[in-house]
Each structure stands twice: as structure tokens, then as C-alpha cells.
């Protein structure tokens, strides 16, 4: 049996509804919520050691790029980072992904798809933590 995944959702009230939190929990996730503030989010990441963090690119205190930088600089276990934003550009997307994001979602997006993506990415991360390195993974395109 796979371990329960821990997900931190960093969003203002109303952005991530109770229904979506319940949907995650019904699929076996432990959900922790924090208001959209990067400084508060960093405290939760340090305390909770989540498997997945869903956060907006722009937050009070510290933005998503800053959060990912601090996690790396402090040597904290790296969660799967899912970044949400209201707009996109190729340069911005490249910067976010290079900073350590695992997925970048442009709003509006389907919460069902994000929930599915959380479990897909968390499963891949668990597989990697069980001894398979990224260099062991191969993609074959036919």
C-alpha cells in the first residue's frame, strides 16, 4: 500500500473550495491549507514536510520562485511544486520550471484536472524516492 500523500494548498478563501479539499481527502490525501502568503507557506513546508505544494505564482511576503529557492537553499525535502498563475509567457514558464516547479497551471483551470495531476506527480515522486533516479527513467517516442 502506498503512503498517504500530504498536500499543502496555499490559496485565499474561495480560490480552493472546501469541495476540492474534500475531493483530495476522499482520494486519500492529507490536506493542509494556508492563506496565500509565501512566508506563512514556508513555515508550513518546514513543519509539515509535504509531498505536494500547490501555490500561486504571486503571493504576499515571498512569491513562488522565492519559496522554491528557500526550500532548496535550506536543504528541505523538495515537494512536488504545482504553480498556478492567471497568465503566462514562454520566458516566465521557463523561469518557473528552471526554479524547480513540476507543473505550471494557467487559470482558469479544471480543479478536477489539478487534483488528478497532484496524484500523478506525487506517485512519480514516490517512485523516484524509492530508489529510481531521474537518470534511470527513459522516454521512448514512437
Regions found by a protein language model. Give the residues of each.
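Acidic, metal-coordinating helix/loop segments flanking the phosphotransfer/catalytic sites
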Residues: 34-52
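CheY-like receiver
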Residues: 124-142
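Short amphipathic alpha-helix used as the core "switch/output" element in two-component signaling
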Residues: 65-76
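Active-site residues of response regulator receiver
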Residues: 55-57, 85
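Acidic catalytic/metal-coordinating carboxylates
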Residues: 37, 63-66
Amino acid at each position: 500500500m502506498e503512503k498517504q500523500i500530504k498536500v499543502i494548498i496555499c490559496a485565499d478563501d474561495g480560490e480552493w473550495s472546501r469541495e476540492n479539499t474534500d475531493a483530495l481527502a476522499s482520494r486519500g490525501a492529507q490536506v493542509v491549507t494556508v492563506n496565500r502568503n509565501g512566508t506563512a507557506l514556508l513555515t508550513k513546508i518546514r513543519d509539515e514536510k509535504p509531498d505536494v505544494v500547490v501555490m500561486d505564482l504571486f503571493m504576499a511576503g515571498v512569491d513562488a520562485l522565492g519559496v522554491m529557492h528557500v526550500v532548496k537553499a535550506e536543504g528541505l525535502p523538495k515537494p512536488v511544486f504545482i504553480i498556478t498563475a492567471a497568465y503566462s509567457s514562454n520566458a516566465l514558464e521557463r523561469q518557473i520550471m528552471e526554479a524547480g516547479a513540476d507543473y505550471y497551471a494557467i487559470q482558469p483551470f479544471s480543479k478536477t484536472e489539478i487534483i488528478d495531476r497532484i496524484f500523478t506527480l506525487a506517485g512519480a515522486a514516490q517512485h523516484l524516492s524509492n530508489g529510481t533516479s531521474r537518470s534511470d527513467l527513459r522516454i521512448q517516442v514512437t
